[in-house]
């Protein structure tokens, strides 16, 4: 299964965000690029939250998503948030995955409203990854608010749980992108490009991304 994006266009007033954008997504992929270039807008279009001005897409089947806002149920604890949207996910699996991502047993009992930003982000990531009937994953900056060790753990969990499902993961974190081991693309104008040997062997592209990250 693939996500096929053909000639998408989107404007907000006088600003063009996407122009004649096309991309064939086969399996898990990372999308990078400068802030404001249209990465989040692209995901919102694929989720049906924005309407494109032109173009079409196909292959987004029963998507699960990580948004820039975590959108947890504030009165529920982390386990219950996962079970609520897991479509048959059992509490034992939810608890196991949360503990593996650095939660202490006592923290599993806290309502989401009392969790830190990084903890909420980990719950949001697992909520998408553990949704049992999701066939497509659209993940917008899922590692925000995590330290280096938690990012490493989150990357391992993401790779394990995504499998080969069509996935677009947006990130400014070049190190995390490389750790994932997926195809890395850079959103530039109307294309999603990648150097022949990936960003790790393209110093100019890597430097651009690091500048973007440091400027945030």
Report the location of each language-model feature.
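Helix-to-loop junction immediately C-terminal to a conserved catalytic motif
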Residues: 47
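Q-loop/switch helix immediately C-terminal to the Walker
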Residues: 75-93
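Conserved beta-strand-loop-alpha-helix hinge in the C-terminal portion
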Residues: 187-216
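Conserved ABC ATPase signature
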Residues: 111-115, 119
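ABC ATPase nucleotide-binding domain "signature" region
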Residues: 123-130
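ABC-family nucleotide-binding domains
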Residues: 140, 147
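Conserved ABC ATPase "signature" region
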Residues: 91-107, 129
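Walker B catalytic motif
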Residues: 111, 141-142
């Amino acid at each position: 299964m693939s996500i096929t994006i053909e000639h998408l266009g989107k404007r907000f007033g006088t600003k063009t965000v996407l122009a004649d954008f096309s991309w064939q997504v086969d399996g898990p992929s990372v999308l990078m690029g400068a802030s404001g270039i249209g990465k989040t807008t692209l995901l919102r279009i694929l989720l049906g939250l924005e309407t494109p001005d032109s173009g079409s897409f196909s292959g987004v089947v029963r998507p699960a998503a990580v948004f820039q806002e975590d959108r947890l149920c504030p009165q529920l604890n982390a386990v219950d948030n996962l079970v609520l949207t897991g479509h048959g996910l059992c509490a034992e699996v939810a608890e196991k995955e949360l503990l593996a991502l650095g939660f202490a047993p006592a923290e599993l009992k806290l309502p989401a409203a009392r969790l830190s930003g990084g903890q909420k982000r980990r719950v949001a990531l697992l909520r998408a990854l553990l949704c049992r009937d999701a066939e497509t994953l659209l993940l917008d900056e899922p590692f925000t608010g995590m330290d280096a060790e938690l990012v490493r753990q989150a990357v391992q969990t993401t790779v394990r749980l995504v499998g080969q499902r069509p996935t677009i993961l947006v990130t400014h974190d070049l190190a995390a992108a490389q750790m994932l081991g997926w195809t890395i693309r850079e959103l530039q104008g109307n294309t999603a490009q990648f150097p022949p040997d990936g960003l790790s062997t393209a110093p100019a592209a890597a430097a651009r991304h690091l500048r973007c990250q440091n400027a945030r």
